[in-house]
């Protein structure tokens, strides 16, 4: 069985960061970095796709020297530095309001203990 036609080449490839480009200790694999750079040199767009926030993903994107867009917050934010604004696919406002209600209704819950990452744009987790 032939999976791909002869001469076929992808236009875009996406890679997760944690556990794919990094090891179990979150150390970046420099062989993986070199492979991503070779893909882009060959004209294949590389997308970083991760659950990390945009600021973290952008830092790695710059370090590697990529040109493709980034997909972060588990698909909640799509962005490229050349775009005027990121595409935010979810707001997280309902979860934030639920957390505030929970803190008001249950005095044993410290509202200061219900937080999320300050860099999150599309998710708000309890």
Residue ranges and their predicted role:
Residues 27-118:
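Active-site phosphate-binding/coordination module
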Residues 1-15:
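Non-catalytic pre-domain segments flanking phosphatase-related domains
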Residues 122-126:
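A generic structural motif
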Residues 23:
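Short helix N-cap motif at coil->helix boundaries in the Bergerat
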């Amino acid at each position: 069985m032939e999976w791909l036609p002869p001469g076929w080449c992808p236009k875009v490839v996406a890679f997760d960061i944690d556990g794919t480009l990094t090891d179990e200790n979150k150390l970046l694999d420099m062989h993986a970095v070199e492979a991503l750079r070779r893909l882009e040199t060959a004209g294949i767009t590389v997308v970083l796709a991760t659950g990390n926030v945009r600021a973290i993903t952008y830092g790695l994107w710059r370090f590697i020297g990529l040109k493709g867009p980034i997909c972060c917050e588990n698909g909640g934010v799509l962005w490229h530095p050349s775009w005027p604004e990121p595409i935010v696919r979810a707001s997280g406002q309902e979860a934030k309001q639920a957390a505030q209600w929970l803190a008001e209704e249950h005095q044993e819950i410290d509202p200061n203990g219900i937080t999320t990452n300050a860099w999150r744009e599309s998710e708000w987790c309890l």
